[in-house]
Design a protein with these regions (language model features):
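The feature marks proteins involved in alpha-glucan
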Residues: 22-46, 82-188
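Core domains of carbohydrate- and sulfate-ester-processing enzymes
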Residues: 99-151, 220-236, 242, 289-308, ...
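Active-site-proximal helices and loops of the catalytic beta/alpha 8
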Residues: 72-82, 87, 228, 234-235, ...
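Substrate-binding/active-site clefts of carbohydrate-active enzymes
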Residues: 165-341, 358-370, 374, 420
Length: 426
């Protein structure tokens, strides 16, 4: 595949994975309270489950309980109570394991619509409803003994980028779980000519890290129709803290995608390979009707001088990392993947949309977990962000972002010519 084809595919991915939103009027979000307590939206025990949601502009908040992750009506609706700093909470005193739930927020006398919440960590098929699970049941055998492969210096890293489906989908790969997380757990696979495939191929290459294209729950693939041809790179985020269901053997069972993702990480670690996630916090697949906008309208996105959604991502919106709770969301999310899934590094898509302070705060938080967890990203944006240039995590501000790597597009352009101009050579 040549570079021109890659650019075309990228444009198709953006077109199918991102949608624009409608006009929105700015409001003084600096007056919103900042919640500093434990940010967990679902805490399960066999005796009770506590639900929490940060929704500071809400008049009322309800949690709706369902028997299934898709279809049917809620069998129970529970009113939540305001707690502190914009948080709403309720405790349901019964064993809810295996049930599903959504939140609905009332603002200006209008119910905004169901969401799985801001911080959902387990969901049903297509990620429309969050799930009540027992987290101990998501750990594969040996998970507590899993260790990161050693890394002395970031300069020793050799990174191989892969897309879950593309890497293992070929019918001659000898892989049983083609196109799935589990493909990277299978050893001894090869083509009919004896060429190594899957994880054995990665080992023979001698790479130290694999960079996984978006592996969180994204919008563009219908998980109920996996027998149909569907494809996207995954740059259309829906639920940031949940593995993508189309790469699991059963997207209907919430525990399966979590367990299988962990199995993949553990297998790569045993092979001496660290795991980097491609993370896309700079935009969401949809704005109006999405989880952020239905929960705290306007807060998580920037607007332009006309009050319309800003669009430095080229995908219809750009998130407002400089706002305290969006900043905290990003920090909590990255650290969650590092702790719960033992992720070893993060590649930030369009990092130049984010502010310097937030990126440094993420680096500081990861250092407390393990300073060998790497961070790097694209030090640019697809358009002009609605934040002063001096505050942005752009490539020219690399000196203000210690221990955060950046891609160098000058090296690319010197080899193949300027991006977007195939008529001009290097």
């Amino acid at each position: 595949m040549n570079l021109k084809q890659l650019v075309v595919m990228s444009a198709v991915a953006v077109a199918t994975g991102c949608t624009s939103s409608q006009q929105h009027t700015s409001t003084p979000f600096d007056e919103y309270p900042v919640y500093e307590g434990e940010w967990v939206e679902m805490a399960y025990t066999p005796a009770s489950t506590r639900f929490s949601l940060w929704a500071p502009s809400a008049q009322e908040v309800r949690v709706l309980l369902y028997e299934k992750g898709q279809g049917g009506s809620a069998y129970r609706m529970v009113k939540m109570e305001p707690a502190s700093d914009g948080l709403w909470q309720v405790r349901v005193d019964e064993d809810l394991k295996g049930k599903f739930y959504t939140f609905n927020v009332k603002i200006d006398d209008v119910w905004q619509g169901d969401t799985p919440g801001l911080m959902a960590k387990a969901v049903g098929v297509n990620g429309d409803r969050a799930a009540v699970i027992d987290w101990k049941e998501t750990n594969p055998e040996g998970w507590n003994e899993d260790k990161r492969p050693p890394l002395k210096r970031f300069s020793d890293m050799v990174i191989y980028e892969l897309h879950h489906r593309d890497f293992s989908i070929d019918t001659i790969s000898g892989i049983r779980n083609r196109g799935r997380f589990l493909a990277l757990t299978e050893e001894g696979t090869h083509t009919y000519l004896g060429e190594k495939t899957g994880i054995d191929h990665l080992k023979e290459l001698g790479v130290t890290h694999v960079q996984l294209l978006p592996s969180f729950d994204f919008s563009s693939v219908d998980e109920t129709k996996l027998d149909k041809p569907q494809y996207n790179w995954g740059y259309d985020p829906k639920n940031y803290n949940v593995p993508e269901g189309s790469y699991a053997t059963d997207p209907y069972q919430p525990e399966v995608r979590i367990r299988e993702f962990k199995q993949m990480v553990m297998a790569l670690h045993r092979a001496g390979i660290r795991v980097v996630m491609d993370v896309v916090y700079n935009h969401t697949a949809i704005t109006k009707g999405g989880n952020f906008e239905r929960t705290v309208p306007g807060y998580f996105y920037r607007t332009d001088e006309e009050g319309k959604w800003a669009n430095a991502s080229g995908c219809g919106n750009e998130t407002a990392s400089e706002r305290p709770m969006m900043r905290r969301f990003m920090i909590e999310s990255v650290c969650y993947w590092a702790r719960e899934y033992h992720i070893d590094g993060f590649r930030f898509d369009l990092m130049g949309i984010h502010d310097i302070e937030t990126m440094n705060a993420i680096r500081k938080a990861l250092d407390k977990i393990d300073p060998t967890i790497c961070m790097y990203g694209e030090g640019w944006a697809a358009g002009k962000p609605q934040l002063p240039d001096s505050l942005l995590a752009m490539k020219k501000h690399a000196a203000q972002l210690p221990h955060i790597g950046m891609f160098c597009d000058e090296m690319r352009d010197s080899l193949r010519g300027p991006w977007g101009n195939d008529a001009k050579g290097a």
